């Protein structure tokens, strides 16, 4: 019987998602049965986890590629093994937990605050300077990443989002405006790295139009990969690094 698994994603049909479809293709070449399970095509009932009208069966493994909610947790319960392990995954999808827990001699953490948009503007500026960056705790692909340049742009957070929403406020690293590094790590080994560059946006997300170019996997990057794996136990991950004055 072939090894069976689920990729947890947004939809069953991830037509334009290269990574998901490539994983399915490679699994098939290895005689593995890998199915994309979309959260928005799934519901959890007392009878089981139902996807497109069918109860999902237990499988050998799941690949977690969706961050939010509890449906993904129910799908993970059907598997013998989760990549990444669910407990660690649920912790480290949160940007605050990342800056609070992760450390290495090979990188620095920007100054940060956790709070809502009801914090006095002056108190944040006093701690972080101006401009500063506001980040949604579980956002991705550049969404909910805002550069706060003045009080008016800070007040837009309260206008555009619930006042109860927590934000990670970070100091603005000007040396990294419109550029950063993204490297990929598999069980503590850095396997690839790229530099992302944006024209006219402080964010360097490919989803927002940034260009990419190869970047060498340096000894420092290898150290970061090993340190983060030791601290998290995450099997695979993409790690973003800013350029700074010192590191």
Briefly describe each language-model feature range.
Residues 114, 185-186, 243:
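Generic beta-strand structural signal
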Residues 10-114:
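Conserved N-proximal alpha/beta basic substrate-recognition cap immediately N-terminal to
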Residues 27, 75-76, 102, 125, ...:
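A generic structural signal for well-ordered alpha-helical segments
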């Amino acid at each position: 019987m072939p090894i069976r698994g689920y990729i947890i994603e947004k939809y069953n049909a991830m037509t334009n998602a290269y990574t998901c479809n490539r994983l399915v293709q490679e699994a098939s070449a290895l005689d593995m049965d890998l199915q994309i399970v979309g959260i928005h095509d799934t519901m959890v009932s007392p009878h089981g986890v139902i996807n497109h009208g069918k109860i999902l069966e237990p499988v050998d493994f799941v690949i977690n590629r969706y961050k939010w909610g509890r449906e993904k947790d129910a799908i993970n319960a059907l598997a013998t093994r989760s990549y990444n392990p669910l407990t660690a995954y649920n912790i480290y999808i949160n940007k605050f937990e990342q800056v609070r827990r992760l450390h290495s001699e090979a990188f620095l953490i920007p100054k940060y605050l956790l709070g809502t948009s009801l914090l006095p503007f002056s108190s944040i500026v006093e701690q972080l300077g101006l401009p500063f960056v506001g980040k949604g705790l579980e956002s991705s692909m550049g969404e909910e990443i805002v550069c706060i340049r003045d009080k008016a742009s800070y007040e837009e957070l309260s206008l555009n989002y619930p006042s109860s929403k927590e934000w990670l406020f970070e100091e603005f690293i000007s040396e990294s405006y419109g550029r950063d590094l993204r490297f990929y790590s598999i069980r503590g080994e850095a396997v690839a790295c790229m530099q992302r560059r944006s024209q006219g946006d402080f964010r360097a997300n490919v989803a927002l139009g940034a260009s990419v170019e190869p970047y060498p996997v340096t000894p420092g990057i290898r150290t970061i990969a090993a340190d983060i794996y030791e601290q998290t136990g995450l099997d695979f991950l993409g790690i973003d690094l800013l350029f700074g004055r010192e590191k």
